[in-house]
Amino acid sequence: MKVLVVNCGSSSVKYTLFEMENEKKIAWGIVECGPSKSYYKRQTAVSEEKKNSVKVTSHTEAVELIINDLLDKEIGSIVNIDEIDVIGHRIVHGGDRFSRSVLVTKEVKKGLKECFSIAPLHTPAHYAGILAVEKMLPGIPSVLVFDTAFHQTMPDYAYMYALPFEYYEKYHIRKYGFHGTSHNYVSQRAAIMLGKSLNELKLITAHLGNGSSITAIEKGKVIDTSMGFTPLQGVVMGTRCGDIDPAIIAYIIKIHPKYRNSEALNALMNKESGLLGISGISGDMRSIVKAATESNKKAKLAFETLCYSIKKYISSYYGILNGIDGLVFTAGIGENSPVVREKICVNLHAIGIEIDTEKNNEPSSKERFVSTAYSRVKIMIIPTNEELMIARESRDCLRT
């Protein structure tokens, strides 16, 4: 069985083709599309990465390029299109309408369009990708896999905001959470590493990248997560502010008239804040760490603020879960920054979290434990694999 995973952004289409018998990647790549500087970068299991300039201005053209490439007699990975059994689409926001992965139907597409207003940066692009795939691959079923779906098990007291109730009823304003596909994947891997069923475990998973979220999981179900109605809430991130006093927004609008424009205000909090905002240097943790070691005070402050915000969520979720069995670090920073992991875990021995400095500093891209022998909580580094999780969800959805 072959599954084609598609992730449509506002100006790009990423794809991965899986052979599900052994869950191996056959081909993968990205088409960056636009009026200028568009390119196609691709790789297969038997060939090196190649990058070419292309003239692609739409999702439809990008999908057409990908399919033609997969079918190419010389460099392709399949002989005919019928080898693809199902297409899995990554969808960032499913609102409270979609609590699980679903096969694409007219009704599902109608429901997805209703989510445009709560995720205007992502959902229209996802929808365009679905239409492009339907045009190029008629007859092959598509499945939508939602980043928000894994978090739909949160109890109402965890997802509710203390606003007038009508804002929830009429406008569906509530906590949704994101990175669900990643949190789902690493929690399953953690159970395997610990040699136990997910139903026996209490876990905290930390997806730390340019965007970051922390999730509390009990018996395989999400109890709480740090991101909210949008991915802006929660811990300090690369360019996102995370949790702030909402009254600050009204104050900023008052002192800076340009922020009366909602797009400018949104850009301030999403693209100009976080590590970048505090340091004035970069939203990239690698640059921040380098500058901090060179005695840049703002970089050091940005680093410490981010790590402190993550530590607060971990400590809070430990209390909510009444103890945990494992703490998982994943995604770009979580997997690759030992200095961040150590800063977060230091002085958490009171709640059973003790990191082994030597293990933590070992360079490796594999799943591994980095806790001390005496740590009550097992600390794990687990590389995420959202594409594989989408492929699994698509396969399982097709079979049910």
UniProtKB/Swiss-Prot annotation:
Coiled coil: none
Protein family: Belongs to the acetokinase family.
GO molecular function: acetate kinase activity; ATP binding; magnesium ion binding
Gene this chain is encoded by: ackA
EC number: 2.7.2.1
Intracellular or extracellular location(s): Cytoplasm
Keyword Transport among record annotations: no
The protein's name: Acetate kinase
Pathway: Metabolic intermediate biosynthesis; acetyl-CoA biosynthesis; acetyl-CoA from acetate: step 1/2
Recorded catalytic activity of this chain's protein: acetate + ATP = acetyl phosphate + ADP
Chain residues that bind ATP: 14, 207-211, 284-286, 332-336
Superkingdom in the source lineage: Bacteria
Active site (catalytic residues): 147 (proton donor/acceptor)
Cofactor needs: Mg(2+); Mn(2+)
Quaternary organization: Homodimer.
Site feature location: Transition state stabilizer: 179, 240
Binding site for Mg(2+): 7, 386
Any GO CC annotation of this UniProt entry: cytoplasm
Protein keywords: ATP-binding, Cytoplasm, Kinase, Magnesium, Metal-binding, Nucleotide-binding, Transferase
Gene3D superfamilies the UniProt entry points to: 3.30.420.40
